């Protein structure tokens, strides 16, 4: 697999990411939560980062994104930017 398409939600603290993950598991839409809570400008587009290949994202983020199945949401992933929830959509 050379590339994936993913969305993400970026927050400051792991407990925030865990709270959002719980909301997703209870049926909240990932995209709605990204618009409301993500610190990343992509939040306004539902967290959509589009398609990206290997070497384009920081290693921890890339490893998590490439390890997901389509429509799967990651557990919180820590990078130098904060904590991410990642949803692969393609």
For every predicted segment, state its role.
Residues 30, 43-44, 75:
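Generic macromolecular interface patches on structured domains
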Residues 1-10, 36-37, 60-90:
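Proteostasis/folding factors centered on peptidyl-prolyl cis-trans isomerases
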Residues 15-22, 31-35, 63:
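Solvent-exposed, polar/charged alpha-helical surfaces in well-ordered, non-transmembrane soluble domains
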Residues 26-27, 70:
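Charged, alpha-helical scaffolding/interaction elements associated with membrane systems
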Residues 1-26, 41-57, 86-90:
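Well-structured core secondary-structure elements of compact alpha/beta domains
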């Amino acid at each position: 697999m050379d590339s994936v398409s993913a969305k993400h939600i970026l927050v400051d603290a792991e407990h925030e990411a865990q709270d959002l993950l719980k909301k997703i598991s209870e049926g909240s839409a990932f995209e709605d939560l990204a618009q409301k809570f993500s610190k990343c400008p992509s939040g306004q587009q539902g967290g959509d980062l589009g398609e990206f290949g290997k070497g384009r994202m920081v290693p921890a983020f890339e490893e998590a994104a490439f390890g997901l199945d389509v429509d799967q949401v990651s557990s919180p992933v820590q990078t130098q930017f904060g904590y991410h929830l990642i949803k692969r959509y393609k």
